[in-house]
Amino acid sequence: MLMTAEQYIESLRKLNTRVYMFGEKIENWVDHPMIRPSINCVAMTYELAQDPQYADLMTTKSNLIGKTINRFANLHQSTDDLRKKVKMQRLLGQKTASCFQRCVGMDAFNAVFSTTYEIDQKYGTNYHKNFTEYLKYIQENDLIVDGAMTDPKGDRGLAPSAQKDPDLFLRIVEKREDGIVVRGAKAHQTGSINSHEHIIMPTIAMTEADKDYAVSFACPSDADGLFMIYGRQSCDTRKMEEGADIDLGNKQFGGQEALVVFDNVFIPNDRIFLCQEYDFAGMMVERFAGYHRQSYGGCKVGVGDVVIGAAALAADYNGAQKASHVKDKLIEMTHLNETLYCCGIACSAEGYPTAAGNYQIDLLLANVCKQNITRFPYEIVRLAEDIAGGLMVTMPSEADFKSETVVGRDGETIGDFCNKFFAAAPTCTTEERMRVLRFLENICLGASAVGYRTESMHGAGSPQAQRIMIARQGNINAKKELAKAIAGIK
């Protein structure tokens, strides 16, 4: 049964998740002002699934349990499923202007499903059955799963087994008859605290020397020995200021990252999906990366829609909307944003079935998509800053605009002067101008810049990772033969 947004939030309260921030344990993390906006983002994935207007995008019928499920728990059954995934992600980006945190889990489901099938084919293991039963449980209960791939990595020039500290990549430290014990951490984990469960994957291709690091499994967020340390974001403590509203830029929604620590966590056999089969670590990584690079052609585009709208509003409020250079910049922003969407849709339309039966995206086009994502959002926010003007970063606080402290010769307050000197076109109030500029500050430089700027660079793999895959998938030799044929070279 599909949960409501309210039921999702209440379900988090029932977990015994250990969360630490600023060196202290956070007892009521669900209502903590720095965390709650990210929970609201996830809740939106539940809210829209309940809305008939969005049912076709947000929900689908499960091929495993035969019931209606949230699309975030779906195994893609067609290229239409892949396209709807991207459209759903764009919609949620438009509704939250933030990272809504469920994409990694969805992409992990599809990568692990197909990879475990092929592991079982080679080694006669039961990983595919383990995973299928696990996903049925997730679908039946409409749960959030954090997909966790990135290890801390330590010295990037060394393999996992060659690190000075062996825990810098998550690893198996003990094998038992009933399961395994793991130790290490997963870094930069988007939405991990807001998740009911975690599904762990290796972060790189591995050799036999690294076999203890070749592990994939699932565990609950409140597993014994698991805890999370909340990651900071630019301007994050603004959320803790009394009565904070306008200065936040995006009061209701936000992203979240954390370091997830596994301090000797036991994993039972039925929740293990890869255990020392090192030759399949690379396949799992590559498939997950492909799905996640496709995802960015949806979510970042939706956020981009809001950024473009905010820039256009700022131009209106500044009285500059008719300037030809402003119009041209908005056209360029739209061109860049829609190019990203084209990439997301293209790699979906060119998808194909895996041996396990679910659909995989076109890997080359997915990597082209993410390569563009590493660049275009930066240009979009640069143009937004250009249109907005310097007040975006020099504006006094909301408290100053509301201040009744008398400072003027004729009894004027601080608020009177702020509202007087920061008024703009008659089509808007000073507060409306403040609000749109604070939003742009937040998305360009503040807490939301984590999800729209730096995540666009490094999320789903840093730029060079895509270039390696583009080189691998680009089939240059075939292109040489085409050129030879046209040029008459034998």
Curated annotation (Swiss-Prot):
Binding annotation for FAD: 149-156, 188-190, 325, 386-390
GO molecular function, one term: vinylacetyl-CoA delta-isomerase activity
Keyword 4Fe-4S in annotation: yes
Superkingdom of the source species: Bacteria
Binding site for [4Fe-4S] cluster: C99, C103, H292, C299
Reaction equation(s) it catalyzes: 4-hydroxybutanoyl-CoA = (2E)-butenoyl-CoA + H2O; vinylacetyl-CoA = (2E)-butenoyl-CoA
Disulfide bonding pattern of the chain: none
Keywords attached to this entry: 4Fe-4S, FAD, Flavoprotein, Iron, Iron-sulfur, Isomerase, Lyase, Metal-binding, Multifunctional enzyme, Oxidoreductase
Keyword Metal-binding part of the UniProt annotation: yes
Cofactors: FAD; [4Fe-4S] cluster
Enzyme Commission identifier(s): 4.2.1.120, 5.3.3.3
Cofactor note: Binds 1 FAD per subunit.
Subunit and interaction comment: Homotetramer.
Function: Catalyzes the reversible conversion of 4-hydroxybutyryl-CoA to crotonyl-CoA. The mechanism of the reaction seems to go through three steps: (1) the FAD-dependent oxidation of 4-hydroxybutyryl-CoA to 4-hydroxycrotonyl-CoA; (2) the hydroxyl group is substituted by a hydride derived from the now reduced FAD in an SN2' reaction leading to vinylacetyl-CoA; (3) isomerization to yield crotonyl-CoA.
Protein name: 4-hydroxybutyryl-CoA dehydratase/vinylacetyl-CoA-Delta-isomerase
Protein's organism: Clostridium aminobutyricum
